Amino acid sequence: MDSVEEPQKKVFKARKTMRASDRQQLDAVHRVKGELLRADGKLLNGSHENGDLDPTSPLENTDCIQDREEVNGIDGICFQSEESTTEWKETPCMPNVAVKNKQEDLNSEALSPSITCDLSSRVTTEPGSGSPASDNPGCGTPVSDNPASDNPASDNPASDNPDSGDLAAGELATTVQATGDSACEEPPSSDPSSSDPTSSEPSSSEPTCSEPISGDPVSEEAASHDLVSGDSTCSEPVSGEPVSHEAASSEPATSEPASDEPVARVVAACELAPGESALDDCAPSGDSQSDEPPSSEDSLPRSVCSGLASGELTPGELSVEPATDTVKPSSSAVCEAGPDPDKTEPSSNNSDDCPGKSEDDEHLDQIQSKDSCDEGNKVNSNVVEKEEPLETHSAIICSDLPPENTTKIAEDPIAEPALEEEAISSSMEVDQSEKDEHKSPAEPVAAVSEDPAEEDKEDTVVDNTDSMETDEIIPILEKLAPTEDELSCFSKASLLPVETSQDLEDKMEGSFGSPSKQESSENLPKEAFLVLSDEEDLSCGKDESEAVAQSKMSTPEGEKSEKDGKAEEEERVPAEEQPPVRNEFSRRKRSKSEDMDSVESKRRRYMDEEYEAEFQVKITAKGDINQKLQKVIQWLLQEKLCALQCAVFDKTLAELKTRVEKIECNKRHKAVLTELQAKIARLTKRFGAAKDDLKKRQESPPNPPISPGKPANDTNSNNNMTYRNAGTVRQLLESKRNVSEGPPPSFQTPVNTVSSASHATSTAVVSSQPKLQTSATSGSLPAAPLLPAPSTATVVATTQVPSGTPQPTISLQPLPVILHVPVAVTSQPQLLQSHPGTLVTNQPSGNVEFISVQSQPTVSGLTKNPVSLPPLPNPTKPNIPSVPSPSSIQRNSSTTAAPLGTTLAVQAVPTAHSIVQATRTSLPTVGPSGLYSSSSSRGPIQMKIPISTFSPPSSAEQNSSATPRIVTENQTNKTVDSSINKKAADSTSQSGKASSSDSSGVIDLTMDDEESGTTQDPKKISPPSSSTVSTSQPMSRPLQPILPAPPLQPSGVPTSGPSQATIHVLPTAPTTVNVTHRPVTQVTTRLPVPRAPANHQVVYTTLPAPTTQAPLRGTVMQAPAVRQVNPQNSVTVRVPQTTTYVVNNGLTLGSAGPQLTVHHRPPQVHNEPPRPLHPAPLPEAPQPQRLPPEAASTSLPQKPHLKLARVQSQNGIVLSWSVLEVDRSCATVDSYHLYAYHEEPSATVPSQWKKIGEVKALPLPMACTLTQFVSGSKYYFAVRAKDIYGRFGPFCDPQSTDVISSSQNS
């Protein structure tokens, strides 16, 4: 029992805490105190009435029960409201009592509400305890608790479940209804309900229980009892099992055992009497639930014995005990449930039915035996049962009460319910007590009868009961004062002046309506605490009070309600001592109380404050309660204060944390800003340096220009060197290969470029040009395909102006950089070179700004065409009709006008291909820009070399007529500005016209102007005449198949004649690479420079930077120089000399953008014989003598893509190669063979390709560095793979580089 008491205390603590959390309860209590006086009167009346009722015979009890039922019906209803308002409050306990009665009436509904309330109370109360959880859950475990009640589903639901929520109630209703249950309705029937309110409730409960078990009460009971018989199964099983569960729940281990035992007893008890068995069930359940199942059980056993005899006693006892223990709604539930089963039995005849019902027969037999004493006995046992639960409570409160039980059994049934209620008071106890009370009315009568029989057992029970009684009273008071529910429970069950207390309760409920809910959690816990603490004390106090005078008690208790509730725990022991005296009063009080309770339950529901008043009245029982309550309140206040202080502290701490975070955040921001500023400063310095570098480079290219007289190679080499040196860093960074070094005058270079271009499979389509140009230009055009375009976008085809001077070659290495090398070559190649200086700046964003440098003398102005090349800068310089390496380059040879009309398009394939469309039209007059087309008169040779993508400078001045815009289409990148394309197209069309007119062979450089006009109209207007280069001698040199038509080579102009200047633009550094032109005239950016038709080969080598290509900036400046093409030589510049755009696809897409080499080699002087194309055809691959059979399943090694880059520090060339896409079907590569080809003016033969080394295959991409080259020479490199079977794969597209240019450029 002590153990039970402790759990109760726990519950008390929980409630106390809740109450503390909600101060409203205290206020309500205070308000209630005001009403205490009134409550006192009512309590006195109620007490008296209770006393009367208590004595009343079972019949009267039945009346009370009926009354209660009615009241309960109302109560149930009220409680339902209350339940909703304060389902969890103690009031529910009262409602339970009421519910029991009502449940008899409503049974399920009433019980449900009241039980719900009760359970709610319990749950609130008990949950703290833990048992409550089980209890309420008992209730709560609806099945468990009420199930303990034997109404697991039903009663418990009704009673407990309500707690569980209305679910219980619903369940109850449902179960009860479902059960319909006579059990459900059993109250009436069971009440026989008359059996007793308790019984009736149990009835209702039982029905509920019954329901759970089965529709029919008897069956339920039987089943229940059976279950009970099952012991834990018993009523508990039915609902009883839940009880068991609850018991288990409450105190699973003991509970169950106890439960089982109680169950057995309960079975007996249930069978014995409706109320009793319900109680009994409850008891078992309660017992099991009870922390002191043993004790409880012991009591139960006694009770059970008695209870079995009386049938209900044990259940009641257990029930009460559990209730007390658990406070435990479980107990209460059990009690209720027990009664329910009993009631079911009552309905079916508590004893007989139960016995008939099931195994319970045994128990019934026992119960009947014990019960057999009579239903009165049952009632008694019910009472006893309740007492026992009370006893349990008492036990919980004090194990001492058992002795007193005997005497008080008769009373105790009533008192016990009251006590039980008190025990329940937390919610649970009240609930139980109310249930008990309901049972009690019947029980009391029966109890009285049984009292003697069961007195022995009940002595113990009585003690418990007494304590329970006190407990119940206290819980009632608590319910009244602390919690509406608790007060209501108290007042109803425990307070004799139930009516008064009920009024108070009603008031309280009304006043606490909302608070009650709030308080129900807070108050209930507090109440539970109070109840638990006070149960014994209150019981004692109340008993004393009752013995003395209820009014007296009521008033003092009312006054002390809150304090009492808190102090009750302490008083419990005294209360327990008093219970014997109180039992009688309790009984009477209970009978009336219950009766009144049913009425008051309703009121209480509405009146929260009244509950408190009632509670207070009860508390008054002890004088020291005030002090205790004060202490408790003080403690609560301290707790609250501490909580507030903690909250303030937390808030302050949070604010501080926020401030600290803000400060830290600011620090971080400052640090980041500082970092960014430092970075910006560094970048600014770099950009400044880059710009200076560009200026220097641009300035330097003009200086290098060699007099036109100089051999093209020298000039080219010088220019290339200069550019290369400037660009070498970029080259290194980008590991681009330089495009052909100083273009050898001979077309060989163009040829080589062509081959590479063809390899690139330039999409360039040269309209019939190729044949017209026999000169290397056609061969060079093939280079147009700028597969490696990734970088190729930067490729600018430099047109060599046939000026007789060396052709400048412009190598644009940086992919990102689109070099517009307007080769405005006056007769001197220098101009071209300086024009080549025009670079297309690539913005890192990937937009390529093409500065078209018009090589045409007329248009020297460079136009910047922003080309947005996402991945690669596509040089879309419409500017030069020079050969667009990837796209067809139209070169008009003097012989064919149409080819001139064609535009070269350099498209940068998304991968690496940039196709430069340069329309080279030698249209003398057509200048899209409105620049007058070059004077075709110049030389028929005038060739328009559209400098591919970049070179706005038409490759030759003659290119100006080509006005080919180099449209670099990034097919992959997709985008050269459409405007550029359009311009290119326009220029192309115009150039086409011009070329047709020029077809005589004269290509006007003016086309360049036109072109520049399209790209950059303003500058294009440079002297047209100079631009004219006679393309009459087209080199029919076949373009590499890939290369679209070869640019027309002026028929008379041999490439060799003009020196070829190569400009290498390396995009490595963001700075722009200056393309050095050696224009005779200074290169003015954007200046239309009359181009002396010099045969300059402009070789644009775009080496894709291995890394992102740094866009070249400041490219424009050179363009003017290029532009300045002065037709120095009356000789028409034979730009037409075949300009070869060598687009090297050697770069693998994966690696840095492929380098695009556009060799535009216009024939030097028209008279010069066409140069041989370079490089010579690659050597044939030897076939292995014999292949192993497995080789048949594999294909030849893939064709590598080669990229060249210059090593600035040493005169070295870096060869890097990879494959565009890995072909899994190829055999494993064993080694790579490197071949080099030194370009010489002499004839080209395959034997000139020398194998320079063999490298064991490693994972691609691979690279190797070659050194020790003869400066001033142009080298071509090719790589092919050899697989493990000795088979050779195809050569990569040959890539060329000008060794000299790097030395010069430095």
From Swiss-Prot:
Give the N-acetylmethionine positions (modified residues).
1
Please name the SUPFAM superfamilies in this protein's record.
Fibronectin type III
User: Biased-composition ranges for Low complexity?
Assistant: 185-212, 246-261, 284-303, 987-1000, 1022-1040
For bias kind Polar residues, which ranges apply?
Answer: 109-134, 143-162, 513-523, 713-722, 948-981
Query: Which spans of this chain does the record mark as coiled coil?
Result: 666-696
Query: Which GO biological process categories is it annotated with?
Result: DNA methylation-dependent constitutive heterochromatin formation; negative regulation of DNA-templated transcription; negative regulation of transcription by RNA polymerase II; positive regulation of DNA-templated transcription
**One of the record's GO molecular function terms:** ATP hydrolysis activity
Tell me the compartments it is located in.
Nucleus
Question: What name is this protein filed under?
Answer: Activating transcription factor 7-interacting protein 1
Record the organism. Mus musculus (Mouse)
